[in-house]
């Protein structure tokens, strides 16, 4: 039994955690913030990082420092009934009631919908959602492989695709960011508005939810002692947070620079679409579709897995993990 993850293991666990955190909303919010903030992008980004990165890190660290197995055990220190109520409410909110369905709709809206005629969009969304959640369920039924699926395959693929977009944009800026005027609330309150936008990613809640997966994965890597699990959980959280912060800032800068050519878009998804087409032409839509599909897929897998593992613990005499995974996938599809 060892005390510390190897550097390679730590990187893969951090990659897995980052992959679960970083979904479509984490792309849409910063690029749109950058467009609106203009030359105030640095102040806006500072606020965004406090709530969009700092709070999720605190959530992961809280589980690590407390040396608890998950949110249920942590919140049950107030009382068992409260712990069950709070845990169920949080997981259902960031799971099948909101965040998981959004993974399918956002990836469809940004990546697939532009290729479909108006008359076929509803049917297209239904078919896409069915396939999307079938894939999510396939990966979620094997929670012991989540480090491989997300940390070693899906997240590296996502980072390669996103890096292609970001590097191209940064090395050929569409405009001089320092000359772009701020818009809306960013004119006089860039920092505070960025603070709110970072909170809107909902990762503050996800930090508590994903902790159980990180703890289980670290234990599967032959680290069993509670203190060692806690220390390595925090290490993985720090590595993941640093990567999140870097990408948030770079994507926000791309958004700010885009104002040199384009007016403020209706939303972050539209911003990504026009910037992608500007740099890559029509193939840019395919790149964009892949970026959002992979981003949403890995987050949905993480959410279904964490919901299934948690509800199996809450109701030890109830359905098995695999049944819970099916239930949450079906609820999200419907």
Description of each model-found segment:
Residues 4-8, 34-59, 78-87, 124, ...:
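Extracellular loop-to-transmembrane helix junctions
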Residues 47-75, 87-101:
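Juxtamembrane transmembrane-helix boundary signature
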Residues 33, 105-124, 219-220, 300-327:
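Helix-loop-helix connectors at the membrane interface of multi-pass transporters/channels
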Residues 11-22, 167-175, 184-254, 287-299:
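Hydrophobic, membrane-embedded alpha-helices of multi-pass small-molecule transporters
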Residues 70-76, 247-297, 313, 317:
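TM-loop-TM module centered on a large, flexible mid-protein loop between adjacent transmembrane helices
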Residues 6-17, 42, 80-94, 124-131, ...:
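Select transmembrane alpha-helical segments in multipass membrane proteins
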Residues 141-169:
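Membrane-interface loop-to-helix entry segments
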Residues 142-153, 191, 214-243, 260-273, ...:
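Hydrophobic, small-residue-rich membrane helices and short re-entrant helix-turn-helix hairpins
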């Amino acid at each position: 039994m060892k005390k510390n993850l190897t550097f390679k293991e730590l990187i893969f666990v951090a990659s897995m955690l980052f992959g679960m955190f970083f979904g479509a909303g984490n792309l849409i919010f910063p690029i749109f913030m950058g467009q609106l903030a203009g030359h105030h992008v640095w102040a806006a980004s500072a606020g965004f990082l406090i709530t969009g990165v700092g709070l999720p890190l605190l959530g992961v660290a809280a589980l690590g420092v407390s040396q608890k197995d998950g949110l249920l055990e942590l919140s049950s220190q107030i009382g068992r009934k409260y712990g069950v109520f709070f845990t169920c409410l949080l997981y259902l909110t960031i799971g099948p009631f909101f965040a998981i369905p959004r993974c399918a709709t956002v990836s469809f809206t940004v990546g697939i919908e532009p290729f479909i005629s108006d008359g076929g969009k509803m049917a297209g969304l239904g078919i896409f959602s069915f396939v999307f959640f079938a894939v999510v369920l396939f990966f979620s039924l094997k929670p012991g492989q989540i480090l491989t699926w997300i940390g070693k395959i899906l997240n590296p693929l996502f980072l390669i695709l996103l890096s292609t977009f970001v590097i191209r944009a940064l090395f050929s800026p569409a405009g001089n960011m320092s000359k772009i005027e701020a818009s809306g609330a960013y004119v006089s309150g860039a920092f505070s508005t960025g603070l709110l936008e970072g909170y809107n990613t909902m990762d503050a809640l996800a930090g508590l939810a994903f902790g159980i997966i990180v703890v289980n994965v670290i234990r599967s890597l032959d680290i069993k002692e509670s203190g060692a699990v806690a220390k390595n959980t925090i290490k993985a959280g720090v590595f993941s947070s640093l990567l999140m912060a870097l990408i948030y800032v770079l994507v926000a800068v791309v958004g700010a620079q885009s104002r040199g050519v384009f007016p403020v878009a209706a939303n972050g998804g539209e911003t990504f679409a026009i910037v992608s087409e500007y740099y890559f032409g029509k193939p840019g839509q395919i790149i964009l579709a892949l970026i959002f599909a992979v981003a949403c897929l890995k987050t949905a897998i993480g959410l279904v897995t964490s919901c299934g593992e948690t509800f199996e613990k809450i109701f030890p005499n109830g359905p098995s993990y695999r049944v819970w995974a099916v239930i949450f996938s079906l609820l999200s599809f419907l």
